Curated annotation (Swiss-Prot):
Gene Ontology biological process: tRNA modification
PANTHER family assigned: RIBOSOMAL PROTEIN S12 METHYLTHIOTRANSFERASE RIMO, RIBOSOMAL PROTEIN US12 METHYLTHIOTRANSFERASE RIMO
Function: Catalyzes the methylthiolation of an aspartic acid residue of ribosomal protein uS12.
Residues holding [4Fe-4S] cluster 1: 27, 63, 92
Cofactor names: [4Fe-4S] cluster
Binding annotation for [4Fe-4S] cluster 2: 164, 168, 171
Name under which the protein is recorded: Ribosomal protein uS12 methylthiotransferase RimO
Upper classification of the organism: Bacteria, Pseudomonadati, Pseudomonadota, Betaproteobacteria, Burkholderiales
C-alpha cells in the first residue's frame, strides 16, 4: 500500500498557504484519485504538510477491499484524529457500511469532519473549503504540466475508467466504486499527452477492467486532435502507443481481462507500439472454481488464448494474480491450477490465500477451508510460480535489454536499479545494474539504458551497461 504525505509547491509568495496533511492508502486506482485531489489543492493555493501536526486539516484516502486494509485505514484515521483533530476521509472505506447499515467510518470515528466514497474530488474539495477556505481562485499556471503525482517523475498511472460491471463473488469493489464508467477518450488522451510532455517515460494504464473500456457508452465516437476516435480498448491503445512513440516512452497495460477482442491488441505489441506486457487477473484455472467465483470470460479457454498471444507476439510477458483456497476448492481443483501454471508458463504470478471480505457473496458458499490449508496451498502455488519465473529469467542471460532507470547513485557509477519491459513498478522484479567498468559510462534516473544481462537472482536480473 502507499502511505504518502506530499509537499506541494506553495504558490503565493509572502503569504503562508493553508497546509493540508495527506495520506494515500490502497491500490494504483486510489493513487490516481489522490493525485487528482492534490492537483486541485495545488491549483487553489493550498500546500501540504508531511506531518499531521501543524496542518490545518488532514485528508486520508482509504482502502476498504480486504480486512487488513480496513484495519490499516481505520488505524490511520485514528492517528490523524489524535495528532491533528481535523480529518476528512475519502476512498473506498468511506463507501462501506457498518452495523445497522450506517457508515462504517462514522461509526468507528464519529468526530471526522466529512466522509466521501472513492473518485469524489469535488466532494472532498467542498469539505476542505468548508473548514479551510481556499486562499485564492485556481489558476492553471500554478500547477505543473503533469499535475501533482505521487509516483516518481518518470512514470505515472493513467486511469481510463471507474467501476466494474462484474459481480465476482469474492469482490466488493462494485458496491464501493459502482458500475463501469468510461472516461471520454479525448480526456484520457489529453491527460496522456500532458503526462508525456511533463517527462513521464512510462505510462501504466489502469482501471477495474481495462478490456471493457467503452462498453458502457457503446463504443461511441469521441474526438482527439481534431479526429474521430472510438471509445474502445484497441483505438485507445493505438493512440496511446503513437503518443508514446513521439516522446520515446513506454505504455504498459494492467487489469486486462482475457476477452477475445484483446487479441486485436497483440499486433500493436509485436510492432513495438506498446510494451508486450499484459497484466491479466486470471484468479484461477479450474472451470468449476471460476464459476463459483462468478468470473467473466471463458476461463476454460484461457490456456488456448495465452498460446495464441505468444504466437502473435513471442516476446510477450504475462503477469497474473490467483486465489488459493477459495471456498469449496478441492485438492484436485488446486492441482489443476498448478498444472495450468506450469503449462501456461506465467512469467510473473502472485497468489493470495483466500480471505473472507465482509459483504462478499463468497462468504455464503459452502466448503470454507481452514486457514492452514489456504496458506499451505498459497505456499505450494508460489513455489511452482517461482520455479517457472526463475527458469524464464535464466533464459534471458546473455541477451541485451532496454532498461528504464529507477535508481542511479553517483550517476550510476556505483551501479543502479532499473526495469525492463517485463517489469512493472512495485509488483514485478527489477534489473540490478552493476557498477560500470569505465567511468565514462553513466546512467540517469528516468532515462533508458541498454544493458547486457549477465545473471539472475530470485525475481531479478543482473546486468551491465553496454
Amino acid at each position: 500500500m502507499n502511505d504518502l504525505a506530499i509537499s506541494l509547491p506553495t504558490p503565493a509568495a509572502g503569504a503562508a498557504a493553508p497546509r493540508i496533511g495527506f495520506v494515500s492508502l490502497g491500490c494504483p486506482k486510489a493513487l490516481t484519485d489522490s493525485e487528482l485531489i492534490l492537483t486541485q489543492l495545488s491549483a487553489e493555493g493550498y500546500a501540504t504538510s508531511k506531518t499531521f501536526q501543524g496542518a490545518d486539516l488532514v485528508i486520508v484516502n482509504t482502502c476498504g477491499f480486504i480486512d487488513d486494509a480496513v484495519r490499516e485505514s481505520l488505524d490511520t484515521i485514528g492517528e490523524a484524529l489524535a495528532e491533528n483533530g481535523k480529518v476528512i476521509v475519502t476512498g473506498c472505506l468511506g463507501a462501506k457500511t457498518g452495523d445497522g447499515g450506517g457508515n462504517l467510518v462514522r461509526q468507528m470515528h464519529p468526530s471526522v469532519l466529512a466522509v466521501t466514497g472513492p473518485h469524489a474530488t469535488q466532494e472532498v474539495m467542498d469539505a476542505v473549503h468548508q473548514h479551510v477556505p481556499k486562499p485564492h481562485d485556481p489558476f492553471v499556471d500554478l500547477v505543473p504540466p503533469a499535475g501533482i503525482k505521487l509516483t516518481p517523475k518518470h512514470y505515472a498511472y493513467l486511469k481510463i475508467s471507474e467501476g466494474c460491471n462484474h459481480r465476482c463473488s469474492f469482490c466488493i469493489i462494485p458496491s464501493m466504486r459502482g458500475d463501469l464508467v468510461s472516461r471520454p477518450i479525448g480526456d484520457v488522451l489529453t491527460e496522456a499527452q500532458r503526462l508525456f510532455e511533463g517527462g513521464v517515460k512510462e505510462l501504466l494504464v489502469i482501471s477495474q477492467d481495462t478490456s471493457a473500456y467503452g462498453v458502457d457508452v457503446k463504443y461511441r465516437t469521441g474526438f482527439w486532435d481534431g479526429k474521430p476516435v472510438k471509445t474502445r480498448m484497441l483505438d485507445l491503445v493505438a493512440q496511446l502507443g503513437e503518443l508514446a512513440r513521439k516522446h520515446g516512452a513506454w505504455v504498459r497495460l494492467h487489469y486486462v481481462y482475457p476477452y477475445p477482442h484483446v487479441d486485436e491488441v497483440l499486433p500493436l505489441m509485436a510492432e513495438g507500439l506498446v510494451l508486450p506486457y499484459l497484466d491479466v487477473p486470471f484468479q484461477h484455472a479450474h472451470p468449476d472454481v471460476l464459476k463459483r467465483m462468478k468470473r467473466p470470460a471463458s476461463g476454460e479457454r484461457n490456456l488456448e488464448r495465452l498460446l495464441k498471444w505468444r504466437e502473435a507476439c513471442p516476446q510477450i510477458v504475462v503477469r497474473s494474480t490467483f486465489i488459493a483456497g477459495f471456498p469449496g476448492e478441492t485438492e484436485a481443483e488446486f492441482e489443476y491450477l498448478l498444472d495450468f501454471l506450469k503449462e501456461a508458463q506465467i512469467d510473473r504470478a502472485g497468489c493470495f490465500a483466500y480471505s473472507p471480505i465482509e459483504g462478499a457473496p463468497a462468504n455464503l458458499l459452502d466448503g470454507a477451508l481452514p486457514d492452514a490449508v489456504r496458506e499451505e496451498r498459497r505456499a505450494r502455488f508460489m513455489a511452482v510460480a517461482e520455479a517457472v519465473s526463475t527458469a524464464k529469467l535464466q533464459r534471458r542471460v546473455g541477451s541485451s535489454m532496454q532498461v528504464l532507470v529507477d535508481s542511479a547513485p553517483a550517476m550510476g557509477r556505483k551501479g543502479g536499479v532499473g526495469r525492463s519491459y517485463a517489469d512493472a513498478p512495485e509488483i514485478d522484479g527489477t534489473v540490478k545494474i552493476l557498477p560500470p567498468s569505465k567511468a565514462s559510462k553513466t546512467m540517469k534516473v528516468g532515462e533508458f539504458s541498454r544493458v547486457r544481462i549477465v545473471g539472475s537472482q530470485g525475481h531479478d536480473l543482473i546486468g551491465e551497461l553496454i
